[in-house]
């Protein structure tokens, strides 16, 4: 039996990857790990206690907040503030960025952006959900409160990114720019154990993930790509398989392991796309590039986009490199 390596042990062993971090980044990831355990425990009680369903509030995008959205947001925010490595957070569930005002927090080097509970509307039907996080070094002077500019950095400035998937097992997957590593939660020990080291996505795949119910509203290039996916060409391993869970973390995780592409294009209802650049697209783009894949908005690399606002939306195409390139070819051919 191979030796079990916990997330904490792995982070310590990889400390040399952060020559300027002095341990703060490792401790910060430890804060995320702690909050993930708390949220995981609560999710596992869904259906037994009154934590599912709508909270009665809306977020800044006008979307109905679920009770667990609010719960997860509060737990991650509290855990990050308590460790003093973070000067502020921005969340999909918060209208504005939150600057932590304790003196120790003002002296912290990092800001965190997060989607505390992606796919939360799936909770009450027992479908996998997740947490997505992104970490940047602040650009405002240390010793002062965090500013909005600390959060409006292009994705290639991220120092770490990852997600937690709460599914049949709970996994934390993260990168610090030195490979993508996955840790599975052992509830009997209360620790995350290394289960997937140096994860790599296949260059090609035969899975495509998109909400085909919106087909009539898609750009022509996407419609033509979907026809290509469904065409019978055994020599090209087509038709491809359609798999869409409706939870970005779950769809992304499957495609990362098996090879595939996730697509959320612009539509008539969402001409700029629906997914948020800062909370969803940037962290997933960093992960996929570290795993050998590709992420774009249909025109440019996601990680090169300079954000203009906290809740900015973009079209999103992420997955196996050859599949993303094929989507680009269709978009270019059928561009208006």
Swiss-Prot record:
Keywords, in A-Z order: Carbohydrate metabolism, Cytoplasm, Hydrolase, Magnesium, Metal-binding
Annotated positions binding substrate: 118-121, 211, 244, 262-264, 274
Annotated compartments: Cytoplasm
GO cellular component, one term: cytosol
Source taxon at top rank: Bacteria
Recorded catalytic activity of this chain's protein: beta-D-fructose 1,6-bisphosphate + H2O = beta-D-fructose 6-phosphate + phosphate
Listed SUPFAM superfamilies: Carbohydrate phosphatase (SSF56655)
A GO MF label: fructose 1,6-bisphosphate 1-phosphatase activity
Cofactor note: Binds 2 magnesium ions per subunit.
Keyword Electron transport: no
Positions annotated to bind Mg(2+) 1: 92, 115, 117
Predominant location: cytoplasm
GO BP: fructose 1,6-bisphosphate metabolic process; fructose 6-phosphate metabolic process; fructose metabolic process; gluconeogenesis; sucrose biosynthetic process
Recorded metabolic or biological pathway in which this protein acts: Carbohydrate biosynthesis; gluconeogenesis
Family affiliation: Belongs to the FBPase class 1 family.
Self-association and partners: Homotetramer.
Full protein name: Fructose-1,6-bisphosphatase class 1
Organism from which the protein derives: Aliivibrio fischeri (strain ATCC 700601 / ES114) (Vibrio fischeri)
Gene, per the UniProt record: fbp
């Amino acid at each position: 039996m191979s030796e079990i390596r916990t997330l904490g042990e792995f982070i310590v062993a990889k400390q040399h990857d952060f020559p300027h971090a002095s341990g703060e980044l490792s401790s910060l990831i430890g804060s995320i790990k702690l909050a993930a355990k708390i949220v995981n425990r609560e999710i596992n009680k869904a259906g037994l206690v009154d934590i599912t369903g709508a909270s009665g509030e809306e977020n800044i995008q006008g979307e109905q907040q679920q009770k667990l959205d609010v719960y997860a947001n509060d737990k991650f925010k509290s855990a990050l503030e308590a460790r003093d490595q973070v000067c502020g957070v921005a969340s999909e569930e918060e209208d504005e960025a939150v600057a932590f005002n304790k003196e120790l927090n003002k002296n912290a080097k990092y800001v965190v952006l997060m989607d505390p509970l992606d796919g939360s509307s799936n909770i009450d039907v027992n479908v996998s959900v997740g947490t997505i996080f992104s970490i940047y070094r602040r650009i405002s002077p240390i010793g002062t409160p965090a500013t909005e500019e600390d959060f409006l950095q292009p994705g290639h400035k991220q120092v770490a990114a990852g997600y937690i998937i709460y599914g049949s097992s709970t996994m934390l997957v993260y990168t610090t720019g030195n490979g993508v590593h996955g840790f599975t939660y052992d509830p009997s020990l209360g620790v995350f154990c290394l289960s997937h080291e140096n994860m790599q996505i296949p260059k090609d795949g035969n899975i495509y993930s998109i909400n085909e119910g919106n087909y009539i509203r898609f750009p022509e290039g996407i419609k033509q790509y979907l026809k290509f996916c469904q065409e019978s060409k055994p020599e090209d391993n087509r038709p491809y398989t359609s798999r869409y869970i409706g939870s970005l973390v779950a769809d992304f995780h499957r495609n990362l392991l098996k090879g595939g592409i996730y697509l959320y294009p612009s539509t008539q209802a969402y001409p700029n796309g629906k997914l948020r650049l800062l909370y969803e697209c940037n962290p997933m783009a960093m992960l996929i590039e570290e795993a050998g894949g590709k992420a774009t908005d249909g025109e440019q690399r996601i990680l090169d986009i300079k954000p203009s606002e906290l809740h900015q939306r973009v079209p999103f195409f992420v997955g196996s490199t050859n599949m993303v390139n094929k989507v680009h070819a269709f978009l270019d051919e059928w561009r208006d």
